[in-house]
Each structure stands twice: as structure tokens, then as C-alpha cells.
């Protein structure tokens, strides 16, 4: 076939073909976009958009925190006004001698200045807020700790400081507890509060998974040089005393004693010792004998923590350890009247619930979940008998809602009074909820 007889075919250039395909695809996509989405599809799309927006927000927040940096945190702390003592006072000299006899004497002088407290409310996340601290003082607590404060957030974010640090003139003596693993950041955070509390505490005792992830609490204990540097930075840079809360180290007690002595000589003025290791959490007997050995080795006040369930346990703990104070946590959450010597009872818990709500009305917690968490513990035995009221309490959104539930609990208890079990039934208490087999105290320790 000659060239003159070839069919008259015009080839489409590649670019033109691609453009044509793209136009076809775009037309199809436009048609798809124009088609109305089903209700379920719209919900899926909205959910995806919401999740994406949240991811972007968190990403922006992380970037902002990185940009602030440690130096900016220090600058913000030093520039803080509004009555906060953020400057380094003349006696807050990092180069001064922090250990030795002079420090030991100053630690005891501080202890006497705050009244030599024997009954201490522990720092508890979302639980030792102002309303509950005031309630504990009402029943006899002589020293209270704030909930744990995250040093990085506290140093950098004004909103976090406002929401989580709630001092009051009547709430003294008060210790503000911080967690963290950076000396400069811890100091920056603590300088925001030093004018509004009596001491600053370093959390070296939290055994929870979140502390492992955040590298703080009891997960710092194996890093002796680090924890000593944290205490030294605080003691050398603040105008108020520095305290610390630790757990026992695994193995020989000499390891714990050695660490305690190092913290004392780094500037720690009061040491709280919990009588279990990080791994044990609350699952075994508290070793009061080990706490006693730490107390005997130190030259500063020591507070014992762990194993207190009943009022009589406080006396036993102090006698067994020789410590200067007893710190209460879980038992006080269920029965803050323990500070005044009252045992847990169904009848008493109704009155305690009302007393807490009165305090919460005067000093509202930052969220209703905090308020409800307290009532679930205080009313644990009654709510275990009246399950429907648990759901009603869970739906409460404010003090008035919660008070209505307390009224309903009281009415239900009265109606069931004839069939009620003994008020002192240990198996029914919140304290015993996770202690397998109801482990009972033995010599030298307590559950």
C-alpha cells in the first residue's frame, strides 16, 4: 500500500489524551460530589474531619510547647507578677551549703514553724483539691498537699496554673507537689508558688504507668544523680523549704537509706517514705519496719505513708516507725473523718458527703468529675447496696445534682435499715476493693 492510500487517521498527542482523561475524571468526580451523601456517609465524613482537626490541634500545641523551650519557661517564671514571689531571694543561693548540721537544724525549725503536724493529707491527682483539703482540715488534718502539678505545664501555661493551683488563706500549712525530670523547669514552675505555700515537694513516689511514660515519680529513683540534682536545684533556688516523697527501693534497705541520706544532704527538709516498692504499688503489706530504719538514719523530719485503714492504724504506724507524722491517702478519701478518729460507717458517710458538697459549693472543683469521684468513694458502701443510684450520681453535673443523689441515698438507707449489714463490714469498704483476700496487717506492716 502506497503512502497515498493510507487511511486518513489523526493521532491524538499524549498530552491531549491525558487532558481528555483528566477532564473525564473531573467530570465524574464533580458528578459524584454533586450526588447527595447518605446520612451514614455524612456522619462518617464529619467524624473524619473532627478527628483530623483534633490531630492538627494537638500537633500545633506540641509545636508551641517545643518553641517555648526551657529558657522561655524560666523567663516567664521570673517575670511573673500578680503577687507571686518569682525572684531569687537573697538566701536562695545555689552555692550555699545545703546539707550538714545547719540544714538539719533549719529543717526542724521549719517543722516547728508549721506546728509539728502529725496528721497529713497526701498529694492525690484530681483528689486533694481545695474543697477536699478544707474538708480534711475540718476533721483534723494538720498539713495538706496539693495534687501533683506537672512542672513543664505549670512553668509554661498560665491556664494550667490557674486551673490546678488553688491556694486559700485558710488552707495552711500547705505543700505544693511537682513532678518533673529537669532541674531548670522544676525551679521555674516552683517559683510561681513559693510565695503562696509553705514548702515545695518533689514527687518521687508515683508508681503508675503514666509516670513511667512521663519519666517522673518513682521511675526516677534508680537515677540517683538526677534526683539529687532536682532536689539541689529546688533547695538552692527557692525561698521555701523543699520536701520529697519516695518509695522503698527493691532489695536491701541500705539502698533506700543511702538515697534518703543523699536527698537530705542535697537540701531536702522533710522526707515522706511510702513503705512499698514501685513494683508493689498497693498490692501487699506496707513495710513499717523498713520505714523505721530510714527514719533512724536521717537527721530531718520524716513522714510515714502506707498501710493506714482505721484510726487506730495511725497510732500503730507512728509507734512502729518513730516518724514525725503520718500521711493518709486512700483511707482519707473514703473517710476523711479518720483524721478525727472516727471509723468508717454508712451513717457517718452520709454526713461526710454533705460536708464535702458544702465545701465544694464554696470552692468549686475544676470539673464535676472530681466532685463525683469523691462521692463515689465516700458513699461506696451505700452505693454498693443501691446500684441504681450509682448511675444517677454518674449523670450528676453540679453540686445540686449531687446533693439530690445524697438525699436519695439517705432515704434508701433508711428504708433498708432493718436489713442493713454491720456498718463495720471491712469487705464492703472502698479501701479494700483492690486488696485481694482482704490482707490483714501483720507485725511490722499493714495492708
Language-model features and meaning:
Residues 1-120, 125, 130-131, 138, ...:
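Alpha/beta catalytic cores of nucleotide-metabolism and tRNA/nucleoside-modifying enzymes
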Residues 94-113, 124-193, 392:
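Glycine-rich, positively charged N-terminal anion/phosphate-binding segment
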Residues 124-126, 149-151, 179-181, 205-207, ...:
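Active-site beta-loop-alpha junctions enriched in small/polar residues
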Residues 139, 149-155, 182-183, 204-218, ...:
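Conserved radical SAM core fold
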Residues 146, 199-207, 265-276, 326-333:
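Non-cysteine beta-strand/loop elements that form the S-adenosyl-L-methionine
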Residues 161-163, 215-221, 280, 342-345:
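Short glycine-enriched, charge-decorated loop/helix-capping segments at active-site entrances
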Residues 171-242, 247-255, 264, 392:
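Active-site beta->alpha loop and helix N-cap motifs at the rims of alpha/beta catalytic domains
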Amino acid at each position: 500500500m502506497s503512502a497515498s492510500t493510507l487511511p486518513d487517521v489523526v493521532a491524538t498527542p499524549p498530552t491531549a489524551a491525558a487532558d481528555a482523561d483528566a477532564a473525564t475524571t473531573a467530570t465524574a468526580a464533580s458528578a459524584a460530589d454533586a450526588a447527595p451523601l447518605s446520612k451514614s456517609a455524612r456522619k462518617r465524613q464529619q467524624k473524619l474531619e473532627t478527628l483530623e482537626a483534633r490531630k492538627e490541634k494537638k500537633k500545633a500545641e506540641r509545636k508551641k510547647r517545643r518553641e517555648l523551650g526551657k529558657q522561655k519557661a524560666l523567663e516567664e517564671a521570673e517575670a511573673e507578677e500578680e503577687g507571686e514571689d518569682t525572684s531569687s531571694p537573697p538566701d536562695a543561693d545555689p552555692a550555699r551549703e545545703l546539707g550538714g548540721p545547719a540544714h538539719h537544724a533549719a529543717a526542724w525549725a521549719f517543722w516547728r514553724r508549721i506546728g509539728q503536724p502529725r496528721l497529713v493529707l497526701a498529694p492525690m491527682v484530681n483528689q486533694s483539691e481545695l474543697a477536699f483539703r478544707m474538708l480534711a482540715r475540718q476533721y483534723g488534718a494538720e498539713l495538706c498537699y496539693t495534687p501533683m502539678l506537672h512542672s513543664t505545664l505549670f512553668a509554661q501555661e498560665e491556664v494550667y496554673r490557674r486551673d490546678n493551683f488553688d491556694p486559700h488563706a485558710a488552707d495552711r500549712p500547705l505543700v505544693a507537689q511537682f513532678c518533673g525530670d529537669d532541674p531548670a523547669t522544676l525551679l521555674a514552675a516552683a517559683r510561681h508558688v513559693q510565695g503562696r505555700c509553705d514548702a515545695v515537694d518533689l514527687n518521687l513516689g508515683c508508681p503508675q504507668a503514666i509516670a513511667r511514660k512521663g519519666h517522673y515519680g518513682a521511675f526516677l529513683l534508680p537515677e540517683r544523680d538526677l534526683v539529687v540534682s532536682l532536689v539541689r536545684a529546688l533547695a538552692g533556688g527557692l525561698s521555701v523549704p523543699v520536701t520529697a516523697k519516695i518509695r522503698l527501693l527493691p532489695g536491701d534497705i541500705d539502698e533506700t537509706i543511702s538515697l534518703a541520706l543523699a536527698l537530705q544532704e542535697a537540701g531536702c527538709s522533710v522526707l515522706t517514705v511510702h513503705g512499698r516498692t514501685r513494683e508493689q504499688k498497693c498490692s501487699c503489706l506496707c513495710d513499717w519496719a523498713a520505714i523505721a530504719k530510714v527514719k533512724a538514719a536521717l537527721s530531718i523530719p520524716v513522714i510515714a505513708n502506707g498501710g493506714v485503714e482505721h484510726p487506730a492504724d495511725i497510732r500503730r504506724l507512728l509507734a512502729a516507725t518513730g516518724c514525725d507524722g503520718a500521711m493518709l491517702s486512700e483511707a482519707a478519701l473514703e473517710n476523711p473523718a479518720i483524721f478525727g478518729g472516727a471509723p468508717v460507717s454508712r451513717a457517718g458517710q452520709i454526713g461526710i458527703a454533705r460536708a464535702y458538697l458544702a465545701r465544694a459549693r464554696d470552692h468549686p472543683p475544676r470539673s464535676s468529675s472530681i466532685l463525683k469521684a469523691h462521692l463515689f468513694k465516700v458513699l461506696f458502701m451505700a452505693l454498693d447496696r443501691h446500684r441504681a443510684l450509682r448511675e444517677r450520681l454518674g449523670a450528676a453535673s453540679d453540686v445540686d445534682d449531687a446533693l439530690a443523689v445524697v438525699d436519695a441515698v439517705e432515704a434508701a438507707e433508711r428504708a433498708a435499715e432493718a436489713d442493713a449489714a454491720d456498718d463495720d463490714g471491712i469487705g464492703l469498704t472502698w479501701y479494700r476493693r483492690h486488696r485481694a483476700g482482704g490482707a490483714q496487717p501483720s507485725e511490722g506492716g499493714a495492708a
